[in-house]
């Protein structure tokens, strides 16, 4: 196993963060197939439980390779699954991602999750920038990025998601590798 197993389970004040697992497919499919999230899911909505399973399998595999990936997000008080997110290592940067059930928006959970991901990424490889790719009209996600101390460096290269340009939010200026993304 990875020497970073300690990151597979993290607790915040209100959240229980556990590495995504096969047992989470049904709960995460409810989230990733909900049309209200269509603009916020990499690759778009997950049409079937099988597509959700394949999507989270990719994240599961990254835990052993890089020591950090995405967690299933649960409320500590109830154990209810309310989202997915974390930091995934990509070539030259940590990709910050957070997606919460819309019924839990506006309560600070995304910021709490993102801070845990930020701490994890910094503890594993602080030399890599932490990056969030955010639609220019996604004000709530921009607010989370600001609370983490990230800066909006604007549109960068050819970065697109679902055909729309994404803003590069990061904890430092983009290097040459990211300018070409």
Question: Which residue ranges define each predicted feature?
Answer:
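Acyl-donor (CoA/ACP) binding surface of acyl/acetyltransferases
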Residues: 1-40, 57, 70-181
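Active-site rim helix/loop that mediates acceptor-substrate recognition in acyltransferases
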Residues: 45-67, 76
């Amino acid at each position: 196993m990875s020497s970073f197993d300690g990151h597979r389970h993290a607790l915040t004040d209100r959240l229980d963060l556990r590495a995504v697992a096969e047992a989470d497919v049904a709960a995460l499919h409810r989230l990733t197939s909900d049309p209200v999230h269509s603009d916020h899911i990499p690759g778009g909505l997950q049409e079937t439980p099988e597509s959700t399973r394949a999507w989270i399998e990719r994240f599961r595999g990254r835990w052993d390779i890089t020591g950090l990936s995405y967690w299933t997000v649960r409320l500590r008080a109830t154990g209810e699954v309310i989202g997915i997110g974390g930091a995934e290592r990509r070539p030259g940067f940590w990709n910050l991602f957070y997606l919460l059930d819309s019924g839990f928006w506006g309560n600070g959970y995304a910021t709490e999750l993102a801070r845990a991901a930020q701490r994890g990424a910094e503890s594993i490889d602080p030399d890599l920038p932490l990056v969030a790719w955010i639609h220019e009209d996604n004000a709530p996600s921009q607010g989370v990025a600001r609370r983490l101390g990230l800066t909006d460096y604007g549109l960068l290269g050819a970065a697109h998601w679902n055909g729309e340009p994404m803003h590069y939010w990061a904890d430092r200026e983009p290097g040459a590798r990211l300018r070409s993304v």
